[in-house]
C-alpha cells in the first residue's frame, strides 16, 4: 500500500467523524430521543414521519453495542445493550460536533437542499440538546454531573438521578465551550446571549477555584487545559489565556513526578498535545521545549522496521486503548503542524495510521465515499470530472462499510496486539460514547478547515474563521448568575422545547451554576483525587 499524505489522512479522519456523528446522533437511538415530528420541515431528505431510522438524540448514553437491530417498530442500536448513564463531557462533545459541522453543511445552500437541510437540523438539535443539559444534567447546586436514567422506556418518558455526588472540572469545561460556541454560531438567536453568559460564568468558576484544579489528576487537568485552548481559539479571553499559562506550567512539574510513559501512555500523549496547543496560544518557550522532549521520547516507542509502536511492557500481547492509538498519532500531527512546520514525522504518521487505525480492527466500519453524482465528491461542488476528489481523500478501499457489516462506524474501546505474530485482535465490539465523541470532535475541530479548503469551500470565504478570535476580554467581568435559569422563560414559546419529553427530575432547572460550589468541593475533596485518577472517566 502506498504511503498516504497527511492531507489524505486528515481528510479521511474528518470524513469518518462527520459521517459517524450523523449516524450516531440521528439513527442509533442510543440515548433519549427528541420529538421527531418537529424536525419534519428541517430535514427534507427523508420522510421522517414514516422513517423508523430517524431518531435525533437529546443526549447519548455511555455504552452500547454498535450493531444495528432491525424491527418492525424501530431501527437502531440494541436497547438491551444500553448502559443508560449520561456523562456531561460526552454530551457536550456531541453538541460541539454538530455546531462545528454547521459550517460545512451551510455551504450547500442553493446547491443541494438535502445536504443543506442537515445544517438547519444540527442548529435546531444542538439548541435542544443544550437546553436539555442545563435542565437535566446538573445537580441541585447547578454543577454538571453524571446522571442515570432509571426508567426502561427511553423514547417517551425518563427519570434521571445523580449517579453520585462527585463532579469533574473537565465536564464543566467542555460544557463551557459548547454553550459559547452555540452563541457565536447563532448570534441572532434570542438564547445566545444567555448561553454566552453561562459559558463565561463557568470560566469564572475556573478562575475562582484554580487551586482546586491543582488537586486533580494529570489526565483531568490536561482535559481542562485542552478545553481552555479550544475556548481561547473561539474567544481571545484574557482569563482563559492566564489559566492556560498557569495550569500548563503546573502540569509540567506534575508530569515529572512519575513515569507516565509506562503507566499512562494516553495521558502522556494528551499532555504532549496540550503542551503544543498551549505554546501555540501563549508562545511560552518552556511549553515548546517540554513538548519537544516528550515527542522525542514518544518517538523512541516507534519501531520503524515493523511499522509499530510499543507500550512499555514486557508482555507479548499488548492491550492498546483507543486513546493510546489516536492520541499517539495525533500528538505527532499536532506537534508537526504547530511547532516544526515540516513533514518530519510523515512516515511515522502514515505507517501507524494504516496499521493501527485502518488495518487493526480499531474501526468497526468506514462510511462509503460520496458517489460520483454527489456534490460532496467535487471541489467547489461543481459535479465536473476535472474537480472530482479521489476516493482516498475519504476512505481506504480495504475497510468494510456499515452497509456490509451492519455496524456503525465507531472506534472500538481497545484492541490487543501480539508482538510475536504482529497481529491484532479484539474480544468485543463496544460503542464507548466518551471515547468516540472525544475523537470525533478533535478530528472535526483540527481538520475541518483543511478539509473545506481542499474542496474549495472556503477559498475566499472568511465565515468559517469569523467565529474564532472574537476578543471578549471584558466579558468575564460582568456575569449574570441567572443566565441559564432565564432560558426557560426566554424559550418558553419555542417550537423546539426538549422538555416536552416527560421529565421526572427537574430539581436543577433554576439553579445558578455555582450556587454552593464551596460546599461541593468540601464534600468531595477527600475523594476528588480518587475520582480523577482514572484516565478513562467512564
Predicted regions and their residues:
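Glycan-recognition and catalytic cores of secretory/periplasmic carbohydrate-active enzymes
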Residues: 1-538
